[in-house]
Amino acid sequence: MKPRFIAGPPGTGKTHDFILGLYKKLLKEDYAPEKIVILSHTNVAANQIKEAVLKLPEMQGRGFTLKSMKKTISTIHSYCKGRLLPKEKFDLDDHKNLIIQEKYFKLDPQTDIERKHKFYRYISDARGHGKTLEEYWKICNKDSYKPYTVELIKNLYQIYTDYKKHKDNNKCDYADMVEDFLHPDVKDPDIDALVIDECQDSNVPQTLAIEKMSKNVKEGHYYLVGDADQTLFEYSGSDADKYHKLAANPYDELKEGKRCSEAINKHCRKAIEPIWDHYGSHRVWTPAKYSERHNKGSVGEIIKGNGYYLPNLEQSGNLDILLDKIKNTTETFLFTYRGTPSDIRCRNFFIKHG
């Protein structure tokens, strides 16, 4: 099934305007909520969508709850796991068990095994790219996985895999949830509509899983909603090139910005313009306008905002203005810098000023 790509730059209402609007439209066309599947990449986003859907007038009196809606509005991992035989998620206690079995699991002392521990991050990134451990080693930034080598990773991975599969453990990780869903024995879901929120963050196995989910949708109701310019996870397998090409000829484009001032809009457009030129995928993306909720400005007037260059983080007129805004207003701002070690200096600067 060919997807309908919805291009939505920052703050254009991808979630609360397009997705909720589509949900209401499908309900009016007599599509059953049980067969409308909306998936995102984080529990926070999925929960926000669930809560918003349950507040729709069209959903009142139908008996749905946050718990029951989890079957159709959730993360990609959770949806895949829900269609498989029960397994427990591999966690920190399991990691500690592996350390007892093999000390090299503790070569990286990091306890955040889902995001920071070098061994688990490597196998997650390799699988996210659809590569074997050896294939990924040839293309990755090896320094980011030190002190592990590919030979050590392969040895530990065998121990890790055997541990998960042992009948007394029966564990899985996030990648397993998606890969197990892709097994031919798992039937294609019987759903009428599929919406993927922030689709640009999908890695290789997730993309294959999404395609499997879309096999039985009705009347072309297969939507990828996202922003190619916000493809942040290429390091873990997302495909920016694919989404920039989709953005060059989208099914629909969300044009009205509701978050960024004109100053921020221009700053971001200048940064991303060369990419748009390369793909021929320019966005309209207008600056935000004042509305009644702002309690200032004229309703419908473009929010101008301001842009300030800071020569340093010690003393300048613009720095005084910035600090005043941070401490004495509720205004939001975009603060940009260039790489390391600027990130450390900026973080310490903000900590210093509360």
Question: Which residues does each PLM region occupy?
Answer:
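P-loop NTPase Walker
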Residues: M1-K89
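Accessory N-terminal region flanking or inserted into the helicase ATPase core
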Residues: M1-P9, H16-D17, K35, P109-V195, ...
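Residue-level preference for the first positions of well-ordered beta-strands
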Residues: P3-F5, K35-V37, D192-A193, H221, ...
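Conserved helicase motor core of SF1/SF2 NTP-dependent helicases
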Residues: P9-T15, L20, H41-V44, Q200-G300, ...
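Glycine-rich, phosphate-binding/catalytic loops in enzymes
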Residues: L54-E58, K89-F90, E211-S214, D239-Y243, ...
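Short active-site loop/helix that positions an aromatic residue
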Residues: L84-P86, R345-F350
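Interdomain motor-coupling "hinge/lid" segment immediately C-terminal to the ATP-binding subdomain
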Residues: E88-K167, Y251-K255, R259-S291, N306
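Conserved interdomain hinge at the start of the Helicase C-terminal
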Residues: P311-E331
